[in-house]
């Protein structure tokens, strides 16, 4: 099995980021809320809020598991809201000292892992309590949406280069 030399390209699509040749139309980006990235962020925020409300309204069996799930869902929701507002109001142009694609990538990696762990923990602690079961289901759904957003935002494509000089 021979493996040829290959070129790995990674691309980051920031949804509503304007290119250098496109005109700016003020502070608010009117196109961003219609992009796939923005719609994924809104869906993630809604599912995280529903998961938080379901677990918060249930009777706590294990206080540590409830607290962990609540903290993870609220921190994840707040960070997604911050990234949504950064793209909506184009703060990435003003705050150039922060690498926004890298910080969003790290947030999605760490946040999705913690959300998945919290959903597993709360699902294992749900002893026929419908609030905890619903919270765990929405936690898993939010984890899936975060993974899908991560996959669609940071695509990795492998392109094999040809070895002939005429190309």
Curated annotation (Swiss-Prot):
The chain crosses the membrane at residues 35-55, 69-89, 102-122, 132-152. Its main location: membrane. GO terms for biological process: B-1a B cell differentiation; chemotaxis. GO terms for cellular component: extracellular space; membrane. GO terms for molecular function: cytokine activity. Belongs to the chemokine-like factor family. InterPro entries: Marvel (IPR008253), MARVEL-CKLF_proteins (IPR050578). It is found in: Membrane. Residues 32-158 form the MARVEL domain. This is CKLF-like MARVEL transmembrane domain-containing protein 7. The keyword RNA-binding does not apply. Pfam families: MARVEL. Keywords: Chemotaxis, Cytokine, Membrane, Transmembrane, Transmembrane helix. It is a multi-pass membrane protein. It comes from the Eukaryota.
